[in-house]
Amino acid sequence: MERFVLKFLLIDKVIAVCLDQKISNERLNPLTEYFFWPQRDAWEDMKNFIDNNDWIDPKDAVNILNRITEVINFWEESAQLKKEDIKNLNIKFPDCVFIVM
């Protein structure tokens, strides 16, 4: 997943995820809007986006979807995450960006 970055918004009882493409070490190109969970199926929304963009390597697609699953599962198991939990998230998922609202 070195070509992509997943960004997660943690909002009370909602988690949202979007996908950005790395252009350089410091520049990102947003590829998707934020997809929300649990109001909608963020995983399925991301899968639909990936399926409609054949330039995304299948290996990257699997890694992106697996990472979304891992983060959502961690978020659900942790009940509600607090701002101080971001450090643990960054350690557990160093390839993702987390923003607590």
UniProtKB/Swiss-Prot annotation:
This is Small ribosomal subunit protein cS23. PANTHER family: 30S RIBOSOMAL PROTEIN 3, CHLOROPLASTIC (PTHR35108), OS04G0461100 PROTEIN (PTHR35108:SF1). Belongs to the chloroplast-specific ribosomal protein cS23 family. The keyword Chloroplast applies. Its main location: plastid. Keywords: Chloroplast, Plastid, Ribonucleoprotein, Ribosomal protein. It is found in: Plastid, Chloroplast. It holds the Pfam family PSRP-3_Ycf65. InterPro entries: PSRP-3/Ycf65_sf, Ribosomal_PSRP3/Ycf65. GO terms for molecular function: structural constituent of ribosome. GO terms for cellular component: chloroplast; ribonucleoprotein complex; ribosome. Probably a ribosomal protein or a ribosome-associated protein. Part of the 30S ribosomal subunit. Transmembrane segments: none annotated. GO terms for biological process: translation.
